[in-house]
């Protein structure tokens, strides 16, 4: 009986993933625009590391790793955090919340789609960058880098769930507030520079950002070929952060949903 119930919930989550990919097909033109922008933006960042004589491959790789990782994590954050805003705009949020499914199933489907969508975009951008730059990944531990990416997804899903409550609390400004949170994480996490260059008080803030440990571990794995054991401390921090943030995100989301229902804030806006 339990197996059947789990299978039913998984199928419902998959239905949400399928629905979101169908929405991408519906707005395919915009997806192409966003993808071109992402590729050009990543290439622009990578060219910063090059010297006029063509040297600086290490700097380019450092920047590319940061750009690719941040691209994946930001997509993960965006898709989870803006799922409520998107459904409100589509006029389907009340139907989704009234559907006979557990809230965990609904949010699980959103998170699965975000992870799959983010991975696809990251792979496309990576191939575009590799086709332009002659990057040497011979010493990279790709398995460890992928493991870091998967583990860090847990933390960002938790943060995204909490950020998804902002559009519930404020239909007009909630989405913009989520962008402010994303910008703060970008600033203190050392995406394009080492956190040691930050002012002392910002370095303290970087310690509470899961992206800091993601970038540190991934760069060690991809630039220096570090093994899972060598980046074990960062992996443990990411695991602990994910274990804490996902239940916390679910709790905060449920509380915000009850508030939105009580105050009538689930109606379409825009």
Give, region by region, the residue ranges found by the protein language model:
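Hydrophobic transmembrane alpha-helices and immediately adjacent juxtamembrane helices
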Residues: 1-270
């Amino acid at each position: 009986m339990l197996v059947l119930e789990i299978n039913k919930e998984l199928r419902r989550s998959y239905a949400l993933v399928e629905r979101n990919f169908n929405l991408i097909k519906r707005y395919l033109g915009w997806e192409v625009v966003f993808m071109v922008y992402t590729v050009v933006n990543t290439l622009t960042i990578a060219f910063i590391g090059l010297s006029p004589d063509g040297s600086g491959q290490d700097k380019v790789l450092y920047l590319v790793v940061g750009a690719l990782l941040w691209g994946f994590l930001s997509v993960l954050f965006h898709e989870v955090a803006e799922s409520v805003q998107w459904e409100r705009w589509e006029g389907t949020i009340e139907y989704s919340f009234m559907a006979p499914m557990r809230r965990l199933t609904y949010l699980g489907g959103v998170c699965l789609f975000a992870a799959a969508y983010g991975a696809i975009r990251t792979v496309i951008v990576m191939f575009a960058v590799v086709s332009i730059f002659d990057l040497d990944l011979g010493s990279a531990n790709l398995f460890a880098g992928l493991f870091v990416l998967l583990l860090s997804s847990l933390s960002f899903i938790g943060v995204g769930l909490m950020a998804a409550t902002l559009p519930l609390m404020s239909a007009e400004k909630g989405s913009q507030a989520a962008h402010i949170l994303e910008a703060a994480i970008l600033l203190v996490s050392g995406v394009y520079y080492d956190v040691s260059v930050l002012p002392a008080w910002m370095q303290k803030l970087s310690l509470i950002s899961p992206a800091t440990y993601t970038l540190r571990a991934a760069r060690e794995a991809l630039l220096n070929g570090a093994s899972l054991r060598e980046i074990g401390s960062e992996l443990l921090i990411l695991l602990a952060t994910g274990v804490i943030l996902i239940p916390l995100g679910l709790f905060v989301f449920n509380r915000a949903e009850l508030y939105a229902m009580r105050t009538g804030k689930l109606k379409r806006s825009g």
